[in-house]
């Protein structure tokens, strides 16, 4: 079981997509959790489907130029049910061949108190 979580700071550029494709190929994750996609839902899903054809995924749009969340999983290795929540995307997961279930929350919050530091 491999779960990869990344703050990608945008999915729009071709160079970023190719870089992510290399990372995903080298690590072979079963579940990918991306934060700060900085995209509305459709472009994020389109970019991810190019990187990982055949995967299933769920996305939440960004709020302007910040935020955006995408969760993806390989249906050959894991069965997931995705729920959009106020806090992010909740995945109820079970890896194939296992009876153990796993709940994963993919969330991203803005840094609200940066002036304090």
Predicted regions and their residues:
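A shared catalytic/ligand-binding motif for oxyanion handling
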Residues: 1-117
């Amino acid at each position: 079981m491999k779960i990869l979580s990344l703050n990608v700071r945008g999915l729009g550029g071709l160079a970023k997509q190719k870089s992510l494709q290399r990372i995903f190929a080298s690590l072979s994750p079963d579940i990918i959790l991306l934060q700060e996609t900085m995209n509305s839902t459709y472009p994020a899903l389109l970019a991810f489907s190019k990187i990982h054809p055949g995967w299933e995924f769920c996305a939440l749009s960004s709020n302007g130029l910040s935020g955006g969340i995408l969760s993806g999983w390989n249906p050959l290795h894991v069965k997931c049910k995705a729920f959009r929540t106020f806090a992010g995307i909740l995945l109820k997961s079970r890896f194939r061949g296992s009876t153990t279930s796993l709940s994963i929350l993919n969330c991203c919050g803005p840094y609200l108190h940066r002036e304090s530091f």
